[in-house]
């Protein structure tokens, strides 16, 4: 007898196709996502026209030779070097004989000053600031700009289309060389000057390049720009910044959709709207000059910055050695594309009433949504578009399922949610087992999620800082935990109660869960302008279609009445005693041709409905769960000869008898509808969030949130596998079990820091100039702060005092330090001050100066009502006082050893007028100037990096009482 063998179906819903295909899809997407996230696109071997990458690299090396904070002599050297480079580039830019280049105007701003404050904090006293500008402003006149030098007139106003601003601050922190914060931004801006003064690249609209000084200490340079005439001319901006040390330059923030589209045309765009929402919701509290340009001036623009690793940020590893020419090119190429688009745009999108009184008339933008695909393409659309699609999906998707369900009931094919059906002729009851597996998915999801999140609490309890150097070990642990236990529970459930409706019920549960998530996301889109929930929209759309397909599959089943009649005829037969124990062989199953010639169905060879006399053993006897895979495999081989290709090959004969009619290949369509877009969007989001947060523990941030976030993201990334995971073979889950064990042991026992991921400890030395007593301090996290402090030779046991109050999750440990040598002469002469009062005692005048410094402070134990610095400008757009008063006044001068005259108005509640007069020193380029800092750098453990705590490395002060 010749058997009719069915051809092999490589996408059948059987263990090997499901295991292999789904694994390949995950690997094919996750690996490129990781590679793109960490590898920077290579710079071209030959510099493109208008730029010189070799020159840019040499400029970066020169710029980062020394620490150059605002309050240092090296900062003056950088200022002079920048002026020299700007004039050299302007003078040597190529010009054709037939066309002259654009006019270039260089403003060395040595006149602007401003008094302002940390406005916006109504519940507490604020910090007032007086700052004198050391900015350099370069204006490249656009080919369509109006001629003339309008800025020379006191009342001069620009005309025509607004210009474009590119900003980069050239000061560094006192403990970092500033290669990426913000050397690459400065070098990029210099190359933009070269590019837009090269023939063929002249800007149509005016371009202003701002090299601002003083960003690190309070965004001072950007605030001072508000008083420069060019601030009235620029309507859009591109801010270049660095909050890491190398890698790709990320689009941190953007004010609106319109400006973002120009960035989206970059060759290698990188970023997601999630970063903007994190700033908006105050999850990220540090700020860049973007805050001033957007919030104070009302300009429209973008914030492009480096973001990782944070362990090198503001340390001596922020140098040229730890970045690359590839990183320079990544920022430069994005800046060229974005700026070229902005200066070439002559439409009206950035002109007109902004609806915000007192700010620029640069039109009204629309909130946007954006994200990149593999660092090579960029999606940009309006938030209103996302909201519209969200609402449509919330309404249409449930209606579609309801209509489909009604249609299934109408044609008598709704097997889901059905326990029994009745034979209309005899009234007999036939079991459909349609509820089998209905509550399996929430059990699988709940247990696997709970176990994954439990690991987050375990790591926090035992080794909370392991993510600082080993984020991928944490990711591997979370993913393998979720995957293994989801598979294990699925297999146990499938072994005990096999169900052909597992897929349909799983997708139905996913539909309900994601629908709730989408409701929440839609509310936040509308009420709070939060766009980072875009992945939920795509997630729900894929799940909705996949769920609908599961419902459509039911139309291929026989009517429940027809099925009941067949079962009724089958029940009239008297089975042999062995029929309960032995499954039919392949030869006993009818071929499709023989089935057509007689009244026989494949269901006829299935197990009978259970009764009181039914054997406890199933037709296909399985002795142990260990034989799960081999039993499944034997079932699959036993039925390989039956049926035609259009029917389900009855892969698992213990499922419901009617399941033979279900499509065997529908699963692959469902999987491809959900998994790829989820892997891409959530994979990129997960890595972005990890890069932004995995080292915030050194700053006192909560790491539990990070671990729980990774756990939840792991579940969401693997969730598309849950409807199919019971079909997986044991091979990959077993391998993941070993990964789980290995990474768990590592994460619980490994030392959390490394040479490339050092723990940052913040240094400050406070000196009482009246007594000469000083306290050197390191601020960091427990328990590592104690190991670092005790490693310093000058620290004596018994003289260390530690406190955690007021340091945001960190501990400050102080000890008597070696006296600094930041100024000449006796330390009592380092700060000079004079205090005088008016006759009515309402105003007190402070005259303050410091040796070898241009930064001082006035600190008040009780907030004052107001203050005025002689010679200062006040801008009504930028308040310098608040409703709760001012507790601190920071004074910055462009000149060394300047004398500030400050008039202070006391509040009526100021019965005790006490405080401190303080000056700061931040220049640590010479050894032995701050010997205690030298010792900390030299003798602290290898896994420690020293950074600054406040504006000054050394603070010398006198107390006063009036």
From Swiss-Prot:
| Taxonomy, superkingdom | Eukaryota
- Under Enzyme Commission nomenclature, its number is 3.4.-.-
Extract the InterPro entries matched here: Fxna-like_M28_dom, M28_fam, Peptidase_M28, PFF1_C, PFF1_TM
Q: Where in the cell is it found?
A: Vacuole membrane
Glycosylation sites per record: 110, 113, 834
Residues of the region (Disordered) are: 568-617
Its cellular-component GO annotations read: vacuolar membrane
Q: What class of enzyme is it?
A: hydrolase
Q: Does the keyword Lyase apply?
A: no
Q: Does the keyword Transmembrane helix apply?
A: yes
* Active-site residues annotated for this sequence: 215
Pfam families given in the database record: Peptidase_M28 (PF04389), PFF1_C (PF22250), PFF1_TM (PF22251)
Residues on the membrane's Vacuolar side span: 37-390, 462-472, 525-534, 689-704, 753-962
Q: How is the cofactor bound?
A: Binds 2 Zn(2+) ions per subunit.
Role according to the record:
May be involved in vacuolar sorting and osmoregulation.
**PANTHER family for the chain:** METALLOPEPTIDASE M28 FAMILY MEMBER, VACUOLAR MEMBRANE PROTEASE
The Swiss-Prot or TrEMBL record describes its family as follows: Belongs to the peptidase M28 family.
Q: What is this protein called?
A: Vacuolar membrane protease
């Amino acid at each position: 007898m010749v058997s009719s063998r069915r051809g092999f179906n490589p996408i059948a819903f059987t263990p090997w196709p499901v295991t292999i295909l789904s694994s390949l899809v995950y690997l094919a997407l996750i690996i490129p996502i990781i590679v793109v996230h960490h590898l920077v696109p290579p710079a071209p071997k030959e510099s493109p026209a208008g730029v010189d990458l070799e020159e840019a690299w040499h400029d970066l090396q020169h710029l980062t030779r020394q620490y150059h904070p605002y309050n240092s002599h090296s900062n003056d050297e950088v200022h002079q070097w920048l002026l020299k480079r700007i004039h050299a580039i302007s003078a040597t830019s190529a010009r054709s004989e037939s066309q002259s280049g654009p006019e270039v105007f260089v403003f060395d701003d040595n006149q602007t000053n401003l008094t302002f404050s940390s406005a916006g904090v109504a519940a507490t006293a604020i910090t007032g600031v007086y700052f004198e500008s050391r900015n350099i402003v370069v204006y490249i006149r656009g080919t369509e700009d109006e001629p003339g030098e309008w800025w020379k007139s006191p009342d001069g106003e620009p005309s025509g289309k607004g210009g474009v601003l590119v900003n980069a601050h050239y000061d560094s922190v006192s403990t970092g060389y500033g290669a990426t914060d913000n050397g690459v931004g400065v070098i990029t801006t210099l190359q933009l000057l070269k590019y837009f003064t090269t023939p063929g690249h002249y800007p149509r609209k005016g371009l202003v390049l701002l090299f601002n000084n003083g960003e690190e200490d309070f965004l001072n340079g950007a605030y001072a720009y508000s008083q420069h005439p060019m601030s009235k001319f620029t309507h859009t901006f591109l801010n270049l910044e660095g909050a890491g040390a190398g890698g790709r330059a990320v689009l941190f923030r953007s004010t609106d959709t319109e400006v973002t589209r120009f960035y989206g045309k970059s060759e290698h765009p990188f970023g997601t709207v999630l970063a903007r929402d994190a700033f908006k919701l105050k999850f990220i509290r540090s700020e860049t000059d973007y805050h001033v340009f957007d919030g104070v001036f009302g300009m429209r623009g973008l914030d492009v910055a480096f973001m990782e690793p944070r362990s090198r940020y503001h340390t001596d590893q922020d140098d040229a050695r730890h970045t690359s020419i590839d990183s320079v090119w990544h920022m430069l190429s994005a800046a060229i594309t974005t700026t070229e688009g902005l200066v070439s745009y002559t439409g009206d999108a950035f002109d007109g009433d902004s609806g915000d009184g007192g700010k620029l008339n640069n039109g009204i933008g629309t909130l946007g949504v954006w994200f990149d695909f593999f660092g090579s393409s960029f999606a940009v659309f309006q938030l209103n578009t996302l909201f519209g699609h969200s609402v449509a999906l919330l309404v249409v998707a449930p209606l579609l399922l309801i209509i489909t369900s009604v249609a299934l009931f109408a044609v008598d094919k709704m097997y889901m949610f059905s326990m029994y059906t009745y034979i209309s002729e005899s009234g007999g009851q036939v079991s459909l087992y349609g509820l089998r597996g209905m509550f399996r998915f929430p059990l699988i999801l709940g247990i696997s999620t709970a176990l994954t999140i439990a690991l987050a609490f375990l790591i926090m309890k035992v080794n909370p800082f392991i993510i600082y150097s080993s984020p991928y070990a944490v990711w591997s642990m979370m993913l393998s935990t979720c995957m293994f236990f989801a598979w294990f529970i699925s297999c146990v459930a499938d072994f005990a109660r096999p169900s052909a409706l597992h897929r349909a019920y799983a997708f139905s549960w996913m539909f309900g869960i994601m629908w709730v998530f989408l409701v929440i996301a839609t509310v936040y889109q509308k009420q709070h302008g939060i766009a980072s929930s875009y992945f939920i929209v795509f997630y729900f759309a894929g799940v909705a279609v996949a769920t609908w397909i599961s419902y459509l599959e039911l139309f291929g089943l026989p009517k429940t009445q027809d099925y009941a009649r067949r079962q009724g005829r089958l029940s009239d037969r008297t089975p042999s005693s062995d029929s309960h124990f032995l499954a039919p062989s392949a030869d006993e199953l009818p071929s499709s041709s023989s089935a057509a010639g007689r009244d026989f169905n494949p269901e006829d060879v299935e197990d009978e409905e259970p009764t009181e006399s039914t054997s406890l053993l199933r037709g296909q006897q399985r002795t142990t769960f260990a034989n799960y895979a081999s039993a499944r495999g034997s079932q699959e081989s036993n039925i390989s000869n039956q049926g035609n290709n259009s029917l389900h090959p009855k892969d698992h004969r213990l499922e419901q008898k009617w399941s033979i009619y279900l499509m065997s290949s529908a699963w692959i369509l469902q999987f491809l509808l959900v998994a790829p877009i989820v892997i891409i969007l959530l994979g990129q989001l997960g890595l972005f969030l990890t890069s932004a947060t995995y080292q915030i523990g050194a700053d006192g941030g909560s790491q539990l949130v990070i671990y729980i976030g990774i756990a939840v993201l792991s579940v969401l990334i693997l969730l598309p596998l849950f409807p199919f995971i019971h079909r997986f073979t044991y091979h990959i889950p077993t391998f993941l079990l070993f990964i789980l064990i290995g990474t768990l042991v590592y994460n619980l026992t490994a030392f959390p820091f490394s040479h490339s991921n050092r723990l940052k400890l913040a240094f400050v030395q406070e000196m009482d100039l009246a007594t000469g007593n000083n306290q050197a301090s390191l601020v960091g996290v427990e328990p590592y702060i104690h190991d670092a402090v005790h490693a310093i030779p000058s620290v004596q046991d018994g003289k260390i005092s530690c406190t955690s109050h007021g340091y945001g999750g960190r501990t400050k440990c102080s000890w008597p330090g070696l006296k600094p040598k930041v100024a000449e002469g006796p330390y009592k002469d380092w700060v000079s001050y004079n205090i005088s009062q008016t006759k009515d005692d309402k105003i007190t005048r402070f005259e303050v100066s410091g040796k070898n410094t241009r930064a001082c402070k006035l600190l008040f134990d009780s907030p004052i009502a107001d203050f005025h610095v002689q010679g200062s400008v006040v801008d009504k757009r930028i308040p310098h006082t608040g409703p709760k008063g001012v507790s601190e006044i920071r004074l910055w001068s462009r000149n060394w050893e300047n004398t500030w005259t400050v008039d202070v108005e006391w509040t009526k509640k100021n019965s005790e007028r006490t405080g401190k007069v303080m000056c700061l020193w931040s220049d640590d380029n010479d050894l032995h100037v701050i010997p205690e800092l030298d010792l900390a750098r030299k003798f602290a453990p290898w896994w420690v990096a020293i950074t600054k705590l406040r504006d000054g490395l050394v603070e010398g002060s006198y107390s006063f009482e009036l």
